[in-house]
Swiss-Prot record:
Subunit structure, as described in the record: Monomer.
Reaction catalysis annotation: 7-aminomethyl-7-carbaguanosine(34) in tRNA + S-adenosyl-L-methionine = epoxyqueuosine(34) in tRNA + adenine + L-methionine + 2 H(+)
Protein name (database record): S-adenosylmethionine:tRNA ribosyltransferase-isomerase
Homology family: Belongs to the QueA family.
Keywords from the named record: Cytoplasm, Queuosine biosynthesis, S-adenosyl-L-methionine, Transferase
EC number(s) recorded for this UniProt protein: 2.4.99.17
Chief location bin: cytoplasm
Compartments in which it is found: Cytoplasm
Phylogenetic lineage: Bacteria, Pseudomonadati, Pseudomonadota, Gammaproteobacteria, Aeromonadales
GO cellular component terms attached to this protein's record: cytoplasm
């Protein structure tokens, strides 16, 4: 297949630049992966759609305030977007400047903080921060929430809460696992009371999630790498869910990629399903056979993105593209702060 197969025209006014006042008040488009049938509702309808014994798998990463503004000692301004924290004093980052900094360049930041560019790794720059304060503390003082480019506005105080899931635990993402933004505490409590089980993977979403696919044939695309963890507790819960006839419900494409990475690594090693800790660059597109996920809760994704390809592999290309056109006609809100889908997997 070609990247152009996944393009669609989206009116600018359907790009959500702010979240809904209530998390669970977003709209929900339900898609049956077998029939292609769609239904419309509100996100809190997931309480009726999920059954006792189902397992919700969340990504518990926490978005860090990864964007900083500074200048070189020579006066040139630059913008830094941290991609990954290497240790307490070093990061890998994207740097936007009129001229790329060379190794040894001093970068002056707000509040008297400074960093030095020590090495370049492809498109990323390794920066070392001066002083005793850990990088995460510095970011919490002077960093901005790294809103996606299509939101097209400066970050505001409210984004510190709303561009973050209510169940986040592990700092490290530079983009939110956006399907999880719709869950609020009352909905989570009601799901628990109904008998829906919860499990947590970690995938620190990188800025690469917003990078366009620059080749035309899907097979030629090199996926960006992100760190993921699928602990033993999650494996045990998946096995227990399977035994009782429940469904594994992935909240977001990052949960999907984490779970399917663990499944593929286990298959490759010739072992039963096992925990996974490491980098993943799994690229899921039509033709992929899902191993673990039965239901996907996800937002509406960018035209031509790897994420709409992942969803198309889950529910069938034509079903997904038709559902997207229906969402556009019905005025659904798109992307990170937008509405959601509840999708059952297409049987092969």
């Amino acid at each position: 297949m070609l990247v152009s197969d996944f393009q669609f025209d989206l009116p600018d006014e359907l790009i959500a630049r702010y979240p809904m006042p209530e998390r669970s008040a977003s709209r929900l488009l339900m898609l049956d992966g077998n029939s292609g049938e769609t239904r419309h509702g509100q996100f809190r309808d997931v309480l009726d759609l999920l059954q006792p014994g189902d397992l919700l798998v969340f990504n518990n990463t926490r978005v860090i305030p990864a964007r900083m503004f500074g200048q070189k000692a020579s006066g040139g301004k630059l913008e830094i977007l941290v991609e990954r924290i290497l240790d307490d004093h070093s990061v890998l980052a994207h740097v936007r400047a009129s001229k790329a900094p060379k190794p040894g360049t001093q970068i002056l930041l707000d509040n008297g903080f400074s960093a030095k560019m020590v090495a370049r790794h492809d498109t990323l720059f390794e920066l070392h921060f001066a002083g005793d304060l850990p990088v995460l503390d510095i970011l919490n003082q002077i960093g901005h929430m790294p809103l996606p480019p299509y939101i097209d506005r400066p970050d505001e105080n409210s984004d510190k809460e709303r561009y973050q899931t209510v169940y986040n635990q592990r700092p490290g993402a530079v983009a939110a696992p956006t399907a999880g933004l719709h869950f609020d505490e009352p909905l989570l409590a009601a799901l628990r009371e109904k008998g829906v089980d919860f499990a947590y993977v970690t995938l620190h979403v990188g800025a690469g999630t917003f990078q366009p696919v620059r080749v035309e044939r899907l097979e030629d695309h090199q996926m960006h790498s992100e760190y993921a963890e699928v602990p033993a507790e999650v494996i045990a819960k998946i096995n227990a869910t399977r035994e009782r006839g429940g469904r594994v419900v992935a909240v977001g494409t990052t949960s999907v990629r984490s779970l399917e990475t663990a499944a593929q690594a286990s298959l490759k090693a010739g072992k039963p399903l096992s925990p996974f800790f490491g980098d993943t660059s799994i690229f899921i597109f039509p033709g992929y056979q899902y191993q673990l996920v039965d239901v996907l809760i996800t937002n509406f994704h960018l035209p031509g993105s790897t994420l709409i390809m992942l969803v198309s592999a889950f529910a069938g290309y034509e079903h997904v593209m038709n559902a997207y056109q229906e969402a556009i006609t019905s005025g659904y809100r798109f992307f990170s702060y937008g509405d959601a889908m509840f999708i059952t997997r297409q049987s092969l």
